[in-house]
Regions:
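Charged docking surfaces used in two-component/phosphorelay signaling
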Residues: 15-23
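Charged, amphipathic alpha-helical segments characteristic of ABC-type P-loop ATPases involved
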Residues: 23-24, 50
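CheY-like receiver
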Residues: 42, 50-125
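Charged phosphotransfer/docking patches of two-component systems
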Residues: 11-15, 87
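Extreme N-terminal starter segment of soluble prokaryotic enzymes
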Residues: 1-4
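Acidic, metal-coordinating helix/loop segments flanking the phosphotransfer/catalytic sites
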Residues: 18, 33-52
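Conserved acidic carboxylate
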Residues: 8
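A generic structural motif
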Residues: 25-32
Length: 126
């Protein structure tokens, strides 16, 4: 995991996630930080080269599941949210993990380890 997209409308949360990611993976590249459904739909309408998307569920302009109704995202997604009631819905849209805010570096590390295991298994199957 080197190339990351963050969808988060709270600046402090986005900065915190970026800092945690660089602590765990110093060579991580934040491809884009998006703050809204509208920005996200526009961004993912193009060809996106990223390894994982970190996505908050509650954005200022609605819930992020609306993004999936407009564009296909074929990149693994790790949801980062304060709401646990969306977990089942999250796993219907390419989610590999669901981190409840506030989460710790160890939680993020476990999610990234899971991403690495899943992508390694996928590469071996090809």
């Amino acid at each position: 995991m080197k190339r990351v997209v963050i969808i988060e409308d709270e600046t402090a949360a986005a900065v915190n996630l970026r800092n945690m990611l660089t602590t765990i993976t110093p060579d991580v590249e934040i491809v884009e930080v998006l703050e809204s459904i509208e920005e996200s739909v526009e961004f993912f309408s193009r060809d996106v080269d990223a390894d994982v998307v970190f996505m908050d569920i509650h954005l200022a302009d609605g819930d992020s599941f609306r993004i999936f109704k407009s564009v296909d995202i074929n990149i693994p997604i790790i949801f980062t949210t304060a709401y646990d009631e969306y977990a089942l819905e999250a796993f219907k849209v390419n989610s590999i993990d669901y981190l409840l805010k506030p989460f710790k570096v160890e939680d993020l590390r476990r999610a990234l380890d899971k991403l690495h295991r899943l992508t390694a298994t996928e590469r071996m199957a090809q």
